[in-house]
């Protein structure tokens, strides 16, 4: 199961969430991870002793209860209620940290952070952050591009010209996200987000030219950090026999399953004389039209059927 350390969570959100260490620095390497029986959204919540969250957030009501607990009004002690398996405690709303909570976290190596932000907002941001960071992931070989604001993954065997095609599309104003190893994350039930590893960011390998820094050559707008994957274009090597067998009026919608998410796919034959960059742009434009409920193939077939019916009626009404 994917997990992250408290240290990384703190580093990634320190300024946005106004986080500060209060105690338990020795537990900075505690792991926060997805459990088999709990979704990511259940990792964060207000202080709960019955079903403890991995990240326990102390708000106004929880702080008041802890003060009563420390004064002995409840008849319980911290050790009776707290689960030492929790990964992190955050005191929100700019509230002071009670000495009892500070000592308990220090003794049990539980990181204790404070934040000036209100607890509901704090939890919302952390849930979104964890949902993206701990998302199920996969790596696909190909080139991931932003074409007409649509995330397009170009796949195919080595040597078919994926990088050259990507370079042509970038020169036409589209943007590169990742080359060679595209990292895909399922950030929602039906949503895949494609990213590039930090090591490969900005680079595109083109045979004969070597490794190119696309940002330096084409400018800042030629690079995107991430994009939702919406369309897969698979390049296949095509000979004369393949082209003869190709269904030229296919109305079947092809999809490819990645991390249990079905993504629309299009197969483009690679042959001498075919302008692949124009074909990719046309495929993306056609996909956008289909999202709007317009299907050119079905429209043509309907028009064809209408014409056939009109011809039949004309022949029936014609005198012998």
From Swiss-Prot:
The text the record gives for the protein's domains is: The Walker A ATP-binding motif also binds Pi and PPi.
The record's function comment reads: Catalyzes the ATP- as well as the pyrophosphate-dependent phosphorylation of a specific serine residue in HPr, a phosphocarrier protein of the phosphoenolpyruvate-dependent sugar phosphotransferase system (PTS). HprK/P also catalyzes the pyrophosphate-producing, inorganic phosphate-dependent dephosphorylation (phosphorolysis) of seryl-phosphorylated HPr (P-Ser-HPr).
Tell me the enzyme class: transferase
Q: What is this protein called?
A: HPr kinase/phosphorylase
Name the lineage: Bacteria, Pseudomonadati, Pseudomonadota, Betaproteobacteria, Neisseriales
Important for the catalytic mechanism of dephosphorylation: annotated segments: 269-274
Q: Name one GO molecular function term.
A: phosphorelay sensor kinase activity
* Sequence intervals crossing the membrane: none
Subunit comment for this entry?
Homohexamer.
Name the EC number(s).
Answer: 2.7.11.-, 2.7.4.-
Q: List, separated by semicolons, the cofactors it needs.
A: Mg(2+)
**Origin: domain of life:** Bacteria
CDD domains recorded: HprK_C
Q: Name one GO biological process term.
A: regulation of carbohydrate metabolic process
Name the gene for this chain: hprK
Q: Which HAMAP family match?
A: HPr_kinase (MF_01249)
Catalytic residues as annotated in Swiss-Prot or TrEMBL: 141, 162, 180, 248
